[in-house]
Amino acid sequence: MLSLSLKKLCKMIYLRPFELLEVNRLISWVNSPELLVQFSGPGFNFPLTKVAWDKHLSDTSIHPYFVVDLNTDETIGYSEIVKVDENEVKLCRLLIGDPDLRGLGLGKLLVRELIYESLAIASPKRILLNVYNHNTAAIKCYQSEGFVINESVSKTSLVDGMEWKSFQMDLML
């Protein structure tokens, strides 16, 4: 019999189009100002609201998804693909909602699913994403899926009086 932790590692996921009527689930996961910035960048105010998220999703280049556990059909995360143009897409706002499910390899599965879905949305030659330099777990996850740090594209945000540096990571196809 598999141990509980090994069973968690064996979980498979799929992407389901996000529906605004379920936004409260997303809002409940983003439960601190720091997590909001890490998840969405500096463009939102805490607490996240349905109105702000609805406005955000009015951009038709954004393809939002819930991340769903294939075994239980439980919604466990959120992510977006932004079509920059036909040759480039950006992965944004990757989040496994339940902290107990983080660090179990689901992020790698999510990145793979997003790469496959990106190919259905466009014909990208490059997939990019942004990550804060202190988010080492995410950086390792993205590197394991072939993304390379591009420090020439970086930004700094002020979060609670501290500077957070982010940089771009690229996957060339």
Language-model-detected regions and their locations in the chain:
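Conserved GNAT acetyl-CoA-binding A-motif
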Residues: 120-130
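Glycine-rich acyl-CoA binding loop
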Residues: 105-111
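Solvent-exposed beta-strand sheet faces enriched in polar/charged residues
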Residues: 82, 128-130, 150
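Active-site acidic-Proline motif in GNAT/NAT acetyltransferases
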Residues: 97-100, 104, 133-134
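Conserved beta-strand-loop-alpha-helix junction that forms the acyl-donor binding cleft
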Residues: 128-139, 156-161
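Conserved active-site alpha-helix within GNAT-family acetyltransferase domains
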Residues: 108, 133-151
